[in-house]
Amino acid sequence: MDEFVKSLLKANYLITPSAYYLLREYYEKGEFSIVELVKFARSRESYIITDALATEFLKVKGLEPILPVETKGGFVSTGESQKEQSYEESFGTKEEISQEIKEGESFISTGSEPLEEELNSIGIEEIGANEELVSNGNDNGGEAIVFDKYGYPMVYAPEEIEVEEKEYSKYEDLTIPMNPDFNYVEIKEDYDVVFDVRNVKLKPPKVKNGNGKEGEIIVEAYASLFRSRLKKLRKILRENPELDNVVDIGKLKYVKEDETVTIIGLVNSKREVNKGLIFEIEDLTGKVKVFLPKDSEDYREAFKVLPDAVVAFKGVYSKRGILYANKFYLPDVPLYRRQKPPLEEKVYAILISDIHVGSKEFCENAFIKFLEWLNGNVETKEEEEIVSRVKYLIIAGDVVDGVGVYPGQYADLTIPDIFDQYEALANLLSHVPKHITMFIAPGNHDAARQAIPQPEFYKEYAKPIYKLKNAVIISNPAVIRLHGRDFLIAHGRGIEDVVGSVPGLTHHKPGLPMVELLKMRHVAPMFGGKVPIAPDPEDLLVIEEVPDVVHMGHVHVYDAVVYRGVQLVNSATWQAQTEFQKMVNIVPTPAKVPVVDIDTAKVVKVLDFSGWC
């Protein structure tokens, strides 16, 4: 192995072939050292030396990039390029169209015979056909994915900025006395962590030899993940009594003409045309084009579905290779569910998220007022009744502001040290009364791997919160059962992909995109969007059982909606608007605290501490 590459691997850094050719000659001439290159890459929050990063590094060093000799092929062969195939479609008319369809390599199917026939026209003109495609990298506002030495996405390459030290408090001297005249109701603890990522035994694929294609192990892991997703969600869809005569896509060519069939598969692509929507759907046996007309009663629901979601269509298969659908189905929540027996006494859970300790916009005074409230310093009889029966506090991620999460973050921090941020958080949470059990999950600002699911915090950074005796650390996502009611806890990054893909949905009303995620029964279904997904061999983001409460955060805006009996809550934040949020038009609603009656699994009150924010 080349000494240059070997040195980078020892430092846990990867390099792309194009970047290697740009840098190798200058490295051999002694123009820069491995240490300089690694420091530069780390400052750019990347563990992979790409050609763009290499070019930028050379410019900083005052060196001209040396371009590699052009070749006809790529650096890594993917085999022969696939030919474009032409299709014709018909749907009750004789109007003609022709559309070019590029077939991509399948993650999950074993392949199906390419369709040779051209489809009859339905007078369809693609919307946005003349628009230029935009790459799905960092250019379009997505977050850079950072990888560890095995190629797995992980969290955090902190910014290395030499600045003057800041003086700050870690709340060591904070005292919040419990109201001596306040009496708490003794309620027996009854909780169980039903699902936690750490409790799932995964067997990642192994490289058989060192001569495999670049990234082969990652591709196989993602293929396994999508097969797992399809299997889990197919099982949920099959529970719908309306789905009869389900046929594998690879067997569609054997169905009788005009026979109504149902298919279940992953959404590879979705396109809007003049007369409806065209999907490419894939299962383990093959792929098929599906046309859903605009006059279908399910058109609006189908329009909102994300790529990589698992759906079902019912319709008639044409021998020309198209399924003409008249019904569309999501895994969704059943219309009727068995009611759970009532509890013998009232007990409440508090939902919060996005505390962002360490940020200069952290609403310190408001959070201290909240802690005082938990300690019995209340103003009304109603609040006294509620706080006396609060038994659980659930925190859905971003408990600290982190370090190096976004460019220029250092200027927004009062506590610039990640260790001290967690110590400050632990000092604050130590004032939560000991009879209240806290559940704490990580988010994208926390010291945890960036890709979801996030198993837990990195203990070397977050050790202080692990020492809290009344704290239970959970994964993102996780399911906890409180007195027989299931709470799905997820930080909520999947909301970003829904808002970015479905017109009319915004961050300002996060309850609606949360409903869409629940309908798809997945925390973050879209692959390659704004949310990095870890290449686990099993999809742990599927919502396999319908919860009673879905609790998310991330978008810093409070909202609560009920969908088919399920209470969905976004618990906002404890951070006022930052300069970065102003630039991206995020208007937070800080210091809102929803209180959930565990018996009914519904929000019964929203406390407002924003007056101290």
UniProtKB/Swiss-Prot annotation:
InterPro entries: Calcineurin-like_PHP_ApaH, DNA_pol_delta/II_ssu, Metallo-depent_PP-like, NA-bd_OB-fold, Pol2_small_arc, PolB_N. GO terms for molecular function: DNA binding; DNA-directed DNA polymerase activity; single-stranded DNA 3'-5' DNA exonuclease activity. Pfam families: Metallophos, PolB_N. SUPFAM superfamilies: Metallo-dependent phosphatases (SSF56300), Nucleic acid-binding proteins (SSF50249). GO terms for biological process: DNA catabolic process; DNA strand elongation involved in DNA replication. The keyword Membrane does not apply. Heterodimer of a large subunit and a small subunit. Possesses two activities: a DNA synthesis (polymerase) and an exonucleolytic activity that degrades single-stranded DNA in the 3' to 5' direction. Has a template-primer preference which is characteristic of a replicative DNA polymerase. This is DNA polymerase II small subunit. It comes from Pyrococcus furiosus (strain ATCC 43587 / DSM 3638 / JCM 8422 / Vc1). The gene is polB.
